[in-house]
Structures are given as structure tokens and as C-alpha cells.
Amino acid sequence: MTAIKKLTLQPRQLSFEILRDIYEQPVILTLPDSAYEAIDASHEDVQTIIRRDKSAYGINTGFGLLAKTRISDDQLELLQRNLIVSHSVGTGEALPANVVRLIMVMKVTSLAQGVSGVRRAVVDSLLGLINNQITPNIPAKGSVGASGDLAPLSHMTLAMMGEGHVYVDGNKVLAADALAQHGLEPITLAAKEGLALINGTQVSTALALRGYFLARDLLETATIVGSLSIDAAKGSDAPFDARIHEVRGHHGQIEIAKAHRQLIKGSAIRASHDGEQDDRVQDPYCLRCQPQVMGACLDIINQAGKTLLIESNAVTDNPLIFNNEDGPVAISGGNFHAEPVAFAADILALAIAEIGSMSERRIALLIDATLSGGLPPFLVDNAGVNSGFMIAHVTAAALASENKSIAHPGSVDSIPTSANQEDHVSMATYCARRLYEMAQNTATIIGIELLAAGQGIDFHRGLETSEPLTMAHQKLREQVTFYDKDRYLAPDIEAAKQLVLDGTLAEHWQPLRSNWYDSK
């Protein structure tokens, strides 16, 4: 059994390394004393504001269009409770535990910066859920990404209050029972605390981070599978000459070209048709333009990453508590508007779709005997009796086409809510949520390409590919045997897809990617 990692969560110090650790496995988190001091000071500021007996939005008023309705001090706790139960209106399947864990951690680091006005008990309640692996039941649908992720974060908060449901060891149970089982007390929310918990972009950001991690994984595996396809189709490595890419200057293009040069280097298949022996003047774009297309994908993945890392460390609730010369003040703003996350998710969708689109084109090339450098039709002996990879390509085409539709930017849509008080929204939650489905589609496409490219390498009997490509081919053959005649192919596709998703094919050439990503 793997030991659970313990981390001290420093506000504004979340890195991609930490975020990925939290995404991939349970953690035990603590906060430094300095964070608790900031939390305590901010809570005392809220008490000072209440004692002034003046209206302060989010503290002693209603919400949204009801912001001008003053709430008496004796109803402030009821106000917060009513806020949570009335906003717990999500629908759809529950978000998975790893995404919910990211949500809660980012909410903790936001509250711990000391401008949200909550008590330390609120933060400790969240840490109790995280550290005891209690996952609030958060329905996936119901947020428009402004004013924050209100509905899903309300479901999270409901669990802290001992209401609704949670998941423990994969089982759905009453939140009250789970808290009692782990010795945790349900929290009663005080002034400002409910709004601080549900006003924020943490759900959209967590879903976008999942898409970001998947996009990186897909690009890395698609690069080595793309090299495997080049060699299988007897493609040229000349288009990856560093000089071509340096005179254009795009970081991603330069790095992807470098990777292909190194991955193909030393291939006997490539040497067999080098120079005058190579009668193909130019390869189709899906082979020779991989640096230009996949490099552009790398660049926008990096751009999305920069945005998401900032947002992961951000305070995005409203109002926020600051100090003027004459004392504390609650200032209303709009940090809850998740437009940056929506834009980041939209460009990740473009990258994921294009990675799959290029992979589908390489599959089409490999099964086409007029383009594939001497490979048999549909990558199988005795074609006609055997159909080979004919319909596997149809599956890839279907998924690539589906992704193109799903990739339509969600951020260009907006629909007014809350009686037109919240009249422009980001749709960030949808933008980010769809990335998972798109990534699964693209992983399947790359898996099919891996099968096809591996098949092509096997047909070059007597000629070895390069060392890194041989390792990738061997890892494939450990899971899937050579396709010598027609057989039930769906299990092979699923096995290859898992190789794509688990990063197996990308492990042995990690040093070639040392300069790919701007944010660590």
C-alpha cells in the first residue's frame, strides 16, 4: 500500500507538480501558522464590519438581485444556511473524487489568503474532508461559470454542514454519517462564510486542470506514435531539420521537430530509403507538418497552463475583505467571473481536437497502399479475405469528427441569470467539463494509430526502427499481438488506448521534453 503524501499547503504556492500529485492520489494537508493568522485577522475584520450596523453585501444582505435587502444580525446564520440549501441545485453525474479533491484544495488555498472573512473552523472543515478522503457528492452540471460555480460549490458546502451525500471508498453515504464516522463535526456557517465558499471558480478550474493534464499526456504520446507512423510509412526526417523551424521561431514547433529528429535517429528503416533511394519528394502533411501542428498545440497548452496556474492560486470569491486607513471594508468585485478559465479550456479543446485529427489522418495514410510506403492494404496479409484496419479507421474518423463539433468554443455563449443582475456569464464549467470526453476520444484515436503504426513496423521485416521507437513498439507488443488475420479488434483498441492514457509510451524519452512546458 502506497503511503499517503503529506503536504503543507502554502497559499499562492500551488505548482503543477503539487496539483498533479493532488489530482492523482489522496493527500494529507496542513496549513502553516501564518495562514491561520491571516484567516483569523480577516474573520475579525468581518466582525468589525457587522458591528458598524451598516449594510455590507454578502455579510448582512441578500444576494444577487436581493443585494439591497438588509438582514438582521439574528438571522445571519440562517441566511448562510438558506444560501447553501437553495443553491444546491446541481444535476447530472457526480464529479470524480480526484476532481473534487482539487476543488477543495483550491478552495482552501483561496480562503487561507486572509481576504475572505471566514473562521479557521471553515478551512479545518474542508481539510477534514480532504484528509479523511471524504468526497462530497457534487453533480457535474448546473454552473454557468459566474457568479462563480455556485451550484456545485453549494453541494460541497452542504457536505461540510452534514447534509446531502458524500462518497467514502466509492460508496455513496449520508454526509452526516460519514462525518460522525471520522469524528468530524458538521459546521454551522457564520456571516459571509457561505458566500465565501460558493463564490469562486474552483470547479471550473479543477475540470480545466484535468483537461490540461490529459492534453499534455496526449501530446506526448501522440508525438512518439507520430514518429512510429513516419517510420512505418517510410517517411522522411528531412522536414524536421532544425534550421527550418528556427527561422520560423515558434517554441512548440522547434521542440516537436527536435523530438521527432531524436526519436527517429538511428532507424534502419529510415536508412533504407535515404538519399537517392527515396523516391517520394514530399510526405503528406500529416507526417511532415507534425512540428507545425503539434507545436502549435504545445504552445496553446502552455498558454492555457499559465492561466490555470494563476487561477489555481487565486482568490475568486466576492466580496473581499481589505483594510483601508479607517478600518476594514468589504469590496464587491467580479473575481468570480471565470472567463480566463473558459478561454483556457476552449484552447485546450482546440489542441485536443487537433491532436486527434492529425492522428486520424496518419491512420488513413497507413492503411492506404498508395501512400503507405509499401505496406499492404489495410495493414493485413491476404487483404480481401481479411479487412484489417479498414473499420478501425472508421472508428477513428467518427471520434475525430465528434471532437471537432465538441470543440466549438463555449466561451462565446452567454445567458443572463439572476433577473439580469448576472447578465454575462463565462460558461467555463461546460468548457472545462467537455475536455474529458474529448480526451477519451483522442486517446482512442491515438491508440488505433499505435496499433496501425506497430503493424507497419512489423511488416518491415529485417529492418529495425530506432531505439526509442523499438521500445515503444515492444511495449505495444507486450499488450497486443501482431494482427496476422482478422480477429475481434475492439479489445486491442482498448488496450492500446490504455497505453496512451497511462503514459507508458512517454516514459523512456522524458529528457527530450525537458523544455516543452513553461510552467512546472
UniProtKB/Swiss-Prot annotation:
Question: What Gene Ontology terms for biological process does this UniProt record contain?
Answer: L-histidine catabolic process to glutamate and formamide; L-histidine catabolic process to glutamate and formate
Catalytic reaction equation(s): L-histidine = trans-urocanate + NH4(+)
**Which GO molecular function, any one, fits this protein according to its record?**
histidine ammonia-lyase activity
Q: In which pathway does it act?
A: Amino-acid degradation; L-histidine degradation into L-glutamate; N-formimidoyl-L-glutamate from L-histidine: step 1/3
5-imidazolinone (Ala-Gly) cross-link: located at 146-148
Q: Which residues carry this modification: 2,3-didehydroalanine (Ser)?
A: 147
The signal peptide, as residue positions, is none
| Keywords, comma-separated and alphabetical | Cytoplasm, Histidine metabolism, Lyase
Q: Which cysteines are joined by disulfide bonds?
A: none
* Family affiliation: Belongs to the PAL/histidase family.
The name on file for this protein is: Histidine ammonia-lyase
Q: Which gene encodes it?
A: hutH
